[in-house]
């Protein structure tokens, strides 16, 4: 009878830490490998500049004078109810949305600024 991945995971989850360490050592010897994490060379400045941020946090820095318009936009962006959206706007500065794509974040910033708010993307 062949063991499934689930059987193996269940067996390992029932082991003590010492038993898992012994299992890892035995696997290293059996297969001639090590369980050490691979080290990565430090990236130069060119590589760091090439990495572009993919997820953004939309932060409402200030609601401005037109709070009603800003509340409407916050509701559209987040799907929050009126009370929750008002709490976000009244609580500025605060996060409107996390994990937004670049396009989504830029569109949200534009909409909020058109409504009279001051917005930051992080």
Curated annotation (Swiss-Prot):
The keyword Magnesium does not apply. The keyword Ribonucleoprotein applies. GO terms for molecular function: mRNA binding; structural constituent of ribosome. One of its GO terms (biological process) is translation. HAMAP family: Ribosomal_bL12. Homodimer. Part of the ribosomal stalk of the 50S ribosomal subunit. Forms a multimeric L10(L12)X complex, where L10 forms an elongated spine to which 2 to 4 L12 dimers bind in a sequential fashion. Binds GTP-bound translation factors. This is Large ribosomal subunit protein bL12. It comes from Pseudomonas aeruginosa (strain ATCC 15692 / DSM 22644 / CIP 104116 / JCM 14847 / LMG 12228 / 1C / PRS 101 / PAO1).
């Amino acid at each position: 009878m062949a063991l499934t991945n689930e059987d193996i995971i269940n067996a390992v989850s029932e082991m003590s830490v010492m038993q898992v360490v012994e299992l890892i050592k035995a696997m290293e010897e059996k297969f001639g490998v090590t369980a050490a994490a691979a080290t990565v060379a430090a990236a130069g400045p060119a590589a760091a500049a090439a990495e572009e941020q993919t997820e953004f946090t939309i932060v409402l820095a200030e609601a401005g004078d037109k709070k009603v318009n800003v509340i409407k936009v916050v509701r559209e962006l987040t799907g929050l109810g009126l009370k929750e959206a008002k709490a976000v706007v009244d609580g500025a500065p605060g996060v409107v949305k996390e994990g937004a794509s670049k396009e989504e974040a830029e569109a949200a910033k534009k909409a909020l600024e058109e409504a009279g708010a001051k917005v930051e993307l992080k």
